[in-house]
From Swiss-Prot:
Organism from which the protein derives: Chloroflexus aggregans (strain MD-66 / DSM 9485)
GO molecular function, a single term: 3-isopropylmalate dehydratase activity
SUPFAM superfamilies in UniProt: LeuD/IlvD-like (SSF52016)
Protein name: 3-isopropylmalate dehydratase small subunit
Annotated metabolic or biological route of this protein: Amino-acid biosynthesis; L-leucine biosynthesis; L-leucine from 3-methyl-2-oxobutanoate: step 2/4
Length: 204
């Protein structure tokens, strides 16, 4: 996992609430355990027309969305089943962060574990971002993870929450297992200082 300090990139807005994980990536794409290639199934029912061609009206397919690395969407993003393929597909497509008023807890946790940054903002901020994007589809945002701030195009800075452990892992580019392995020496020292009592059998 690559360390994340700041993310600066083009945005694309998908102004839909309650997008569930089946809409993010349909179940038929879940038979793989390899993350690569999952971008093909991202929002598959919306991105493609019945004849298999790209839907020109879908936000991600519009020319101005090319190269977008930050997705902005409505509240309760990632609800539904716990499939970890949903954040995998978003990341494989090229997204580094998702901004929304709220996230489903399991989706949020899965995203954090793979280095996809979920940024929760107030509903009013989300509404403003939607309007800003409508006025300027080439809009670029900067997300400062260390400061927990989103820099808006008008110069304002918006704070977003993240727990200390997830923030540490993202800043240092380690997942939960990697963090545990970093503590191997400390764990060994603790075990040496606190030996387990010897189990004995009492004869009667």
């Amino acid at each position: 996992m690559e360390p994340i300090s700041t993310i600066t990139g083009k945005v694309v807005v998908l102004p839909v609430e309650n997008i569930d994980t089946d809409q993010i990536i349909p179940a038929r794409f879940l038979k793989v355990t390899d993350k690569s290639g999952l971008a093909a199934g991202l929002f598959e029912a919306w991105r493609y027309l019945p004849d298999g061609t790209l839907n020109p009206d879908f936000p991600l397919n519009r020319p101005e969305a090319a190269g977008a690395t930050i997705l902005i969407s409505g509240r309760n993003f990632g609800c539904g089943s716990s499939r970890e393929h949903a954040p995998w597909a978003l990341q494989d497509y090229g997204f580094q962060a998702v901004i929304a008023p709220s996230f489903a807890d399991i989706f949020r946790n899965n995203a954090l574990k793979i280095g996809l940054l979920p940024v929760m903002v107030e509903q009013s901020v989300y509404d403003e971002l939607v309007v800003m994007y409508a006025n300027d589809p080439s809009m670029v945002l900067t997300i400062d993870l260390a400061a927990q701030i989103v820099a808006l195009p008008d110069g304002r800075q918006v704070h977003f929450p993240i727990d200390a452990f997830s923030k540490y892992c993202l800043l240092h580019g380690v997942d939960q297992l990697g963090f545990l392995l970093q503590q191997e020496a400390a764990i060994a020292a603790y075990e040496a200082a606190h030996p387990q009592p010897v189990q004995t059998t009492v004869r009667r």
